[in-house]
């Protein structure tokens, strides 16, 4: 089975090696030629139940297929679970000119990486299995053992590689089953966002166990074409750019603080990322531009450029109705500490008089307060109502 994966990954030389040489080059034998624990897991048996895959069409529905790995060699369990998942994972045809591109409802590389993560980072001393639940176009992989010390859902994308079983992770990488050590989570994020799906979810649940969630579905051909038209092109697969773009689409704007949270990087790193993305172009215009009228302190704030907004209009519809606009305004005011009609006009695309009307209505409902009693004069703006007592006079 290992040779099958190696051939599939184009590693013909390693696939044709003798058994002893293969094990040695995979790092699965010690100096005396004896199998390591990782080697035993992969090619002999798992100490407890390994993988358990279940397929359902809808949440709560009857299972239509199940693969119980038991304690068979992990490489066999992995092959059978991945094969079952591949059969159940819808293949969607995306027309592009005179050709059609085929994409799985859950991108194959993200699907594989989620399962790899569920076996390389799990607690193999636990009697619980790694449970792979495939419901519709959604995948969840729950593995026993919580996050290792220092790792949280808020830093898992950028945390230095820290596999629970390093030799197992290295062997699976060398066999072509996993990405190079330390970029598996990045790969899941890239594969999902690049076709318009939500970013993967990561959580520690009671047990403790770690759960990875992939929310697939029909790929977004507009998003795929949009990313392919970025200049420079190579940034279309840049994890930081994809995370920034995802945040802009869902929130309408971001600054260094929001970028830091979205990319899971420091403020200094986020400033560099935004500076780099400022130079990216799409459709003859900038991908992101500074928000007009917004103070540059404590940090610059950005929105999508006009060309990008036109291309991604179908994903920005929430900001075209009154509820979406009000939510954006209040989020901006709370995060930035103030909001003006110039900022609202630039963020939502409405005229300045209408932006002023929106702000007045929010103030009348007690959600905003004016920066001074009389709504006149240059620099007049609004503050979040909850922060009225801490505001400083102009």
What annotation goes with each model-predicted range?
Residues 254, 274-294, 363-374:
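A short, conserved structural fragment
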Residues 263-277, 284, 350-361:
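Short amphipathic alpha-helical interaction segments
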Residues 1-128, 134-140, 145-162, 175, ...:
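Active-site helix-to-loop segments that bind/position phosphate- or nucleotide-bearing substrates
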Residues 250-262, 335-348:
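Short acidic, hydrophobic short linear motifs in intrinsically disordered regions
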Residues 220-243, 305-332:
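Short alpha-helical segments that sit at the start of domains
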Residues 84, 243-251, 328-336, 347:
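Short amphipathic alpha-helical elements of helix-turn-helix/winged-helix folds
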Residues 289-323, 373-394:
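Short, cationic-aromatic polyanion-contact patches
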Residues 155-195, 230-238, 242, 265-275:
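ATP phosphate-binding glycine-rich loop and adjacent ATP-lid/helix-beta elements
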């Amino acid at each position: 089975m290992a040779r099958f994966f190696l051939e599939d990954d184009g590693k013909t030389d390693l696939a044709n090696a003798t058994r002893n040489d293969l094990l040695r080059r995979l790092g699965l034998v010690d100096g005396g030629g004896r199998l390591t624990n990782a080697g035993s897991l992969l090619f002999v048996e798992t100490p407890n139940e390994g993988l358990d895959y279940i397929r359902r069409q809808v949440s709560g529905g009857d299972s239509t297929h199940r693969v119980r790995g038991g304690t068979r060699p992990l490489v066999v369990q992995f092959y059978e679970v991945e094969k079952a998942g591949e059969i159940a994972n819808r293949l969607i045809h995306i027309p592009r000119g005179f050709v059609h591109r085929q994409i799985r409802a859950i991108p194959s590389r993200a699907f594989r990486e989620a399962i790899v993560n569920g076996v390389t980072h799990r607690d193999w001393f636990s009697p619980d299995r790694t449970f792979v639940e495939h419901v519709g176009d959604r995948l969840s992989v729950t593995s026993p053992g919580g996050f290792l010390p220092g790792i949280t859902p808020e830093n898992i994308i950028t945390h230095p590689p820290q596999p629970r079983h390093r030799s197992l992770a290295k062997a699976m990488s060398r066999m072509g089953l996993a990405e190079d050590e330390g970029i598996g989570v990045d790969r899941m994020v890239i594969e999902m966002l690049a076709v318009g799906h939500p970013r993967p979810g990561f959580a520690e649940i009671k047990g403790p166990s770690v759960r990875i969630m992939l929310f697939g579905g029909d790929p977004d051909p507009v998003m795929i074409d949009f990313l392919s038209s970025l200049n420079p092109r190579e940034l279309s697969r840049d994890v930081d750019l994809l995370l920034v773009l995802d945040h802009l689409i869902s929130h309408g704007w971001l600054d260094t603080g929001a970028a830091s949270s979205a990319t899971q990087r420091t403020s200094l790193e986020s400033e560099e990322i935004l500076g780099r993305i400022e130079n990216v172009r799409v459709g003859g215009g900038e991908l992101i531009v500074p928000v007009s009228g917004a103070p540059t302190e404590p940090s610059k704030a950005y929105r999508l450029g006009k060309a990008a907004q036109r291309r991604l209009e179908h994903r920005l519809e929430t900001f075209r109705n009154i509820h979406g606009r009000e939510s954006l305004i209040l989020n901006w005011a709370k995060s930035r500490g103030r909001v003006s009609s110039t900022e609202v006009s630039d963020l939502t695309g409405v005229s300045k008089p209408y932006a002023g009307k929106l702000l007045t209505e929010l103030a009348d409902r007690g959600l905003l307060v004016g920066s001074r009693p009389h709504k006149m004069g240059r620099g007049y703006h609004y503050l979040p109502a909850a922060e009225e007592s801490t505001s400083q006079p102009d």
